[in-house]
Amino acid sequence: MSVIELKNINKYFGSVISREHVHHDINFSAERGQLILVVGPSGSGKSTFLTIAGGLQTPTSGSVEVEGQAVDDLTKAQRDQLRLNRIGFVLQSYNLVPYLKVKEQFEFVNKVKRQGNINKDDLAGLLEQLGISQLVDKYPSELSGGQTQRVAIARALYADPDIVLADEPTAALDSEKVAEVGRLFKDLAETRNKAVVVVTHDIRLLDFADKTYEILDGKISLKDKEHMLDR
């Protein structure tokens, strides 16, 4: 069973007279244990696709379902709880709390989710895996772009969501760190049985993906690795 499914999604911006059609009848699903890439050129609507999938933005028509439950049928409070407890976001804006040190970012997640004390062993392992153990006492303003991105990834994964939605998570990383992030997402999907959806234009992640979709001219289609490498 799909953990998340988009059915006949259409998204328009603008008025009826000057309407921009971003998505045309998008159908997409992800199962637990899968790492899925969604690729496409700049301006193709990849980020809009991700925010619709995560319930941060509503489609003009169509539905989003999480394990068979239509998100539109939920109350606002239920949708908020769904995003808080079931979905982990890694967005391009990072959204780190500027006045909290790196280690405090994770304590903040625990407080928001009301999970009690932080699991220091789990956190230490995650920070080491991402190569950011030495950053725990730094503020976001003291981090490089790549460091900030890795902290944002760690924070999303530490919350232990069922679904991870990542928007260009390797944009500020070198090839070595890209491979580390790819392996981390792959491990998260396979060993922790999560559904991981990564929106990217970074073909270096193709080696780690179970499936790759392309968004082009508002439509989505499944592509094989060889097709994408030949582009």
Predicted regions and their residues:
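Conserved signature/switch motifs of ABC ATPase nucleotide-binding domains
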Residues: L84, K138-S141, A159, R192
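Catalytic Walker B motif of ABC-type/P-loop ATPase nucleotide-binding domains
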Residues: V164-D167
